[in-house]
Curated annotation (Swiss-Prot):
Its cofactor is heme b. It is a multi-pass membrane protein. The chain crosses the membrane at residues 34-54, 78-99, 114-134, 179-199, 227-247, 289-309, 321-341, 348-368. Keywords: Electron transport, Heme, Iron, Membrane, Metal-binding, Mitochondrion, Mitochondrion inner membrane, Respiratory chain, Transmembrane, Transmembrane helix, Transport, Ubiquinone. GO terms for biological process: mitochondrial electron transport, ubiquinol to cytochrome c. Heme 1 (or BL or b562) is low-potential and absorbs at about 562 nm, and heme 2 (or BH or b566) is high-potential and absorbs at about 566 nm. It comes from Squalus acanthias. One of its GO terms (cellular component) is respiratory chain complex III. Belongs to the cytochrome b family. It is found in: Mitochondrion inner membrane. This is Cytochrome b.
Amino acid sequence: MTTNIRKTHPLIKIVNHALVDLPSPSNISIWWNFGSLLGLCLIIQILTGLFLAMHYTADISTAFSSVVHICRDVNYGWLIRNIHANGASLFFICVYLHIARGLYYGSYLFKEAWNIGVILLFLLMATAFVGYVLPWGQMSFWGATVITNLLSAFPYIGDMLVQWIWGGFSIDNATLTRFFAFHFLLPFLIVGLTLIHLLFLHETGSNNPMGLNSDMDKISFHPYFSYKDLLGFFLMIILLALLALFLPNLLGDAENFIPANPLVTPPHIKPEWYFLFAYAILRSIPNKLGGVLALLFSIFILMLIPMLHTSKQRSNIFRPMTQFLFWTLVANAIILTWIGGQPVEQPFILVGQIASVTYFSLFLIIIPLTGWWENKMLNLN
C-alpha cells in the first residue's frame, strides 16, 4: 500500500491539517469566509507592496515624485498602486466583518485566538497608518503630525516619546525613512501572528452559528469549504478590480494629491475612512490625554469581551434582545465613522459624544446586563 505524502511528509502534513483534512463544522455560513479572505488580502498587499517598494524612494525630496513616477512611467505601476491603496480598504472591510461575526456568534470565547486577533488588528492599524504617510502628500504629512503628537499627552515622557518617534524636533526625513522601514516590516510580523492565530483556532476547532459543540458533525475543509471560499475570493477580486480600475480615488482624500507643505494646514485633517470611528472617539473627549486613552481603549476593549460574557448561551442566534443591541452597536460604529469625517462644530460634537458614550456603554454595561437578564428570563441560573 502506497503512503500518501500529504499525510506523511513532515512539512506538507502541517499544511494538510490546516487546509485539507481540517475537521470543520458542517453548518458554518458565509460569515466564516472572511478569515480566508483576510489571508488573500494579506498576500495581495504584500505582493503589490513589494513591487511598489522596488520603485519608491523614502526621502522627503523625492517620495511624492517617486509615487508619480510609479503611476506614470512604471509598467502597470498605476494599477499596482491602485490595487495596494484600495486593497487596504477591502482589508479593513473584511477585518471589521470578521470581528462582527466573532461578536455575534460568541467566537470570542476562544480567548487565545481572540486576543491574538485583537493584537493583529492593532498591528494592521499601525501598518496602515505608517503606509499612509509614505506618499508624502498634504494629508500624509498632517495626519502623521496630528497622530504622532498625541503621544505628547502622556505625562513626563510624552514630549521625549514624540521626538524619539520623529527622529528630531519635527516630522522630517528621519520620520519618513523609519515609517517606510516599519511599513515594510510589520506585514511580515502580521503573517507570523496570523499563523499563531490559526494555531490557537485549530486547537479548539471553529465555532458555528448555533454556538454549540459540533464534534459529532464535522466535515473536511477540502473540498467543501475550500470551494465555498473560492466564491468569496472571486467576489472580492471583482470588487477590488472595479475599485482599482473605475473608482481608484473614491476612498482616498483629494488633499493627498498636493505635495506635503509644512507651512499650509489642510482645512480638515482626517485619517482614512477605516480609522474615522476611533478618530471620532478621540475628538469627542475635550481632554488630550483622556482622548488618547479613549482611542486606545476603543480597540483594546475587544480584549475585555470574553470576561464580560454573562449569557449562558454562546451565540446571539436565539437571543433577540442581544441581537438588537448588536445591531445598535453596528449602527453606532457607522455614526462614529460619519462623525469622524465631519468638521469639529455643532451638532457633530454632541452627536460624536453621545455615540462615544453609547459605544463604551454597550460593551461594558448594557450587553452584559442584557445577557444576565436573558438568563433570568429563561431560568438559566
